[in-house]
Amino acid sequence: MKKFLVFITIFIATFLVLLVFRTDIQDLTLEWEKNGLPEETRIVSTGVPTKNPTALPAPSIVEFSEINLAVPFVPQAPYADWSLPYQEACEETSAILVNKFHKNESITSEIVKNEILKLVEWQKRKFGYYFHTTAEETAIMLRQYFGYKRVDVLRDITINDIKSHLLAGRPVIVPLAGQLVGNPYYRQPGPVYHMLVIKGFTKDGKFITNDVGTKRGQNYVYDANVLFNAIHDAPTGGDGWSVNNPEDYIKTGGKVIIVVYPTHN
């Protein structure tokens, strides 16, 4: 009986310790996983790494087993302020990060905060709202606000399509049913609709992202199939969805990605 009581006591104590330090353990696991990621790199528009000036064809997925583009990171709540408009600013922030990558410009929390506020006002004038911006509306923002000549909204894509753009030096913006990716750092149960940047992939095929929905989102790794299956565009843009179950409604959105080509007007 004493042995049983000792066992129960140890079990309860262990459970309580794990419960108290759960976030710390998650953080340690996250940092350990990030330490094994490929080094961040920049690729010029030809698909050739900048450290190699020779004009060679862009590497294929077979030739290039991993890549991690040097996309800068600041979360959509730059100063941990999750009030409006920041709690709804995943689309704006993803666009800002990709723009800074292509321009090779530095980034700070203050820059992102000010840019988000400008983009919110721009969208209100352009669309009449800034909530739930669709992939096409985000592409319009990238073309008209940021000045990119070519921004593609691609449908019926595959995982290899995404990898091909990454190898060519083009980060990929993806809209998501945010509750399907299982990120423990989201405010649970997670956003119904979300947007993030895919910036690379690992040798074992996982996607490396800058997930603006959490302060821990830099180089956040997702299982490729989990992330791919969660890709759903907003069925409609706007401040509110007049539906009973928005969690089901977002799943009716198409599987699309946004690809920005590094040229400006």
Q: Predicted regions span which residues?
A:
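Active-site-adjacent structural segments surrounding the nucleophilic cysteine of cysteine proteases
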Residues: K3-A135, G178, Y186-P189, K203, ...
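Exposed, flexible binding/inhibitory loops of compact, secreted disulfide-stabilized domains
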Residues: L28-W32, Q144, Y148-K149, S164-A168, ...
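Stable alpha-helical elements in mature extracytoplasmic
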Residues: Y86, C90-A95, V112, T134-L142, ...
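Sec/Tat-exported extracytoplasmic proteins
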Residues: S94, V98-E105, V120, L142-R150, ...
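Noncatalytic regulatory segments and standalone regulatory/sensor domains
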Residues: P189-G190, K199-N265
